[in-house]
Amino acid sequence: KDFNNIGGAAVLMDVKSGEILSLISLPDYDLNKRYSLDSNIYTNKITLGVYELGSVFKTFTVAAGLENKLINPNTVFQNLENKLTCDKYTISEHDKLPKDLNTEQILIRSSNIGAVRIAQKIGIEKYKNFLNSLKILQKIKFDLHEVGDPTAFNWGKCKLATASFGHGITTTPLQ
């Protein structure tokens, strides 16, 4: 209500077993008023909605760097610019950040440029392999029939850069 949101979704999961205990997708609907409703409300946003995850995806970029032993929490990235250009795209920071940040600070301060630098260190193949090992880029199997497909794309240096901070790479909230 405070933000005038028109929809949302949430999943309650058992962290030990991975079992889905509950999921909700809003807005919901009243079947007594089904003829006066927008058809979009019948979409389960958890399983069928495909979205860019944005800055949440930086955790996967950092995890890929840690998993491949290319970074640690204290690895310092020096001379981070507040914006960089990749082909026709400009990547920038939301806020002005210090020029030197370690891995932990990149996550805490949500640095787009820091995430790009980590992804560049990882490289396309290792990054793709890491995401595939988590099945983030694949359609999931689930008890409900309505499950969305992550959007396929061609990898390149700019896709690696934007994917590192969750842009241009899509998946369902359930994934």
Question: Which role fits each region the language model picked out?
Answer:
Residues 1-4, 46:
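Short, basic/aromatic recognition patches
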